[in-house]
From Swiss-Prot:
Domain of life, per lineage: Eukaryota
Identification of the protein by name: Matrix metalloproteinase-17
InterPro entries per the UniProt record, alphabetical: Hemopexin-like_dom, Hemopexin-like_dom_sf, Hemopexin-like_repeat, M10A_MMP, MetalloPept_cat_dom_sf, Pept_M10_metallopeptidase, Pept_M10A, Peptidase_Metallo
Protein species of origin: Mus musculus
Cofactor field: Zn(2+); Ca(2+)
Amino acid sequence: MGRRPRGPGSPRGPGPPRPGPGLPPLLLVLALAAHGGCAAPAPRAEDLSLGVEWLSRFGYLPPADPASGQLQTQEELSKAITAMQQFGGLETTGILDEATLALMKTPRCSLPDLPPGAQSRRKRQTPPPTKWSKRNLSWRVRTFPRDSPLGRDTVRALMYYALKVWSDITPLNFHEVAGNAADIQIDFSKADHNDGYPFDGPGGTVAHAFFPGDHHTAGDTHFDDDEPWTFRSSDAHGMDLFAVAVHEFGHAIGLSHVAAPSSIMQPYYQGPVGDPLRYGLPYEDRVRVWQLYGVRESVSPTAQLDTPEPEEPPLLPEPPNNRSSTPPQKDVPHRCTAHFDAVAQIRGEAFFFKGKYFWRLTRDRHLVSLQPAQMHRFWRGLPLHLDSVDAVYERTSDHKIVFFKGDRYWVFKDNNVEEGYPRPVSDFSLPPGGIDAVFSWAHNDRTYFFKDQLYWRYDDHTRRMDPGYPAQGPLWRGVPSMLDDAMRWSDGASYFFRGQEYWKVLDGELEAAPGYPQSTARDWLVCGEPLADAEDVGPGPQGRSGAQDGLAVCSCTSDAHRLALPSLLLLTPLLWGL
């Protein structure tokens, strides 16, 4: 995979496919050897048997059957080999030469290259593609590799980013969930795992995924647990999990194999594709997935494919000793009952901070996880003894992130602290004692600091406090003067938080919108009524909630139709280049 896995949605590893109950060996040898004639040395009987089994497995010959197998002709076999060579970018000789046999032994996806029945049609017609009828899809890693240097958090992070490759350019949204109701179930299995596509040990086929549809396996993606899965490894014998996963998830959303050598959907594994945080699909794959689902609003089909990269691109961190990142339950604040220390929009996503933890929402207001992530492990450079923050915001002047605690502040580029911090808040001409909230108002591109009933207005571009401040609040009618948090959001509105409620102020307005305050927990943190179609996971403290596989689970809903999610991957950082 790495470029093109096969099969029911999965790439395969190195090694030849096993011979199956195909054509009678003697007839195979006679048919294929006769085709070689004097032009080339006759292939070995073993290669002939494996070759025909391979051609049948991947769609170039009808399924092997002793009754019909005897009717195979030299011409049909030659055509099948020629089609395979064309698809694989080889010279079309029509015989099992060394290059053809070598390609057959290349690690690849389990799915066939040609649709069922294509061999019997005079004009090969691709059946209509299958696709998901909904745009919000859930996923879950149900089983993990047993003997792998990759920890669970790394595996989940790689799955997240492999799916993100497809959702970045289409209207599809992927959400990790706990429980058995996920649309895309991900497993690491060995040998026969009861889906009709048994794995074959190290090498051979390495993974597969099932196309969308009404069947119970639709979207499910399986990886061979006997493969040496790697990530950012110099080991040439390893199988890059991210590259294979991108290919397989292409199948899971409806894409079949293609012959284009640069496509990720080519069936053969071609090695790593690069950093998950920066990888972009080849143009051929973009066009094909756009034909299925259309283009995401934020993406232009004619946009330049190579987008500028940040000077210091973020890295996917390695897991600490492969331990679970789920914090001890006694330390975790509950998102549905807590009021928050700070709320901020960062790179278009919302962050809710409480104690040493934070929750994160995507641009579409989908909660990434029901469990919080640990602040110190994500924002590298915050003091380990820091037990909370007072306020956080992203500067509009340079898009750096500023954290406030007491009379000190820290500046981060992406998730790494800048040198020379912390510094005193007096740099902002603020009095000692800290602030309660901060946000940048889109209406005038000014930053507002709040403390008790006072507020200050600051120009981030000139790094100066505007004259005449502090002023007595509130500035916006209907919004309380003493705030816990404030945030500018991607819809252009500003949001103000106090206790467990929030107020919305439309861009340019000076009073709260009608109907506010509303519940922060319900509208932002997925603490409403259970989803009508959600799996009942049993009673719990907040609606229908409980625990599964050691993870907190909650089936809740909001006006954004959010899905239940398990604990956040601490190794799934933001893609800061958004």
